[in-house]
A protein has these predicted regions:
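Active-site flanking loop/helix segments enriched in acidic
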Residues: 15-44, 66-71
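An amphipathic alpha-helix signature
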Residues: 9, 13-18, 41, 79-87, ...
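Active-site palm subdomain of RNA-directed nucleic acid polymerases
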Residues: 50
Length: 109
C-alpha cells in the first residue's frame, strides 16, 4: 500500500492509515475504499500547495471523509459520522487546535 506521503506529515503514517482501514465497514475494493482515499489524499496535497491551506486538516479530511460510509451510493450521514469518528481520534492519533478541529468538522459535514 502506497501512502503517497510527503517527506514529512504530522498525521499520515502507516499505523494511522491502517487504523482508518480497520474502521471502514465496507469492501476496500469498492468505490470509496483505500484506493479512493489515496487519490483524494494525493489531490488534496496538490491543492494545499496552490492554496496555502492547512495541510494537517486537509490530510485528515482526505483520509477520514469516507471511513464511516455504510453503502457505496446514497449515505447522507456519512460525513457526520466521519466527523464524530475524527473526534474520537483527536488526542490519541492526532493533535488539532480547536479552530483546526472546527475546520475539519465543517469539511467533513
Amino acid at each position: 500500500m502506497s501512502l503517497l506521503t510527503p517527506t514529512t506529515s504530522e498525521v499520515v503514517n502507516q499505523a494511522f492509515v491502517e487504523h482508518c482501514c480497520l474502521a471502514y465497514q465496507m469492501d476496500h475494493e469498492g468505490y470509496h475504499g483505500f484506493d479512493h482515499w489515496m487519490r483524494v489524499l494525493h489531490n488534496g496535497r496538490l491543492l494545499v500547495e496552490g492554496e496555502h491551506a492547512n495541510l494537517k486538516v486537509v490530510e485528515l479530511f482526505c483520509l477520514l471523509h469516507d471511513t464511516q460510509r455504510r453503502n457505496e451510493h446514497v449515505d447522507p450521514q456519512h460525513g457526520q459520522r466521519a466527523a464524530q469518528f475524527a473526534g474520537t481520534l483527536r488526542g490519541d492519533w492526532f493533535e488539532l487546535t480547536d479552530d483546526e478541529m472546527d475546520l475539519l468538522t465543517e469539511a467533513l459535514t
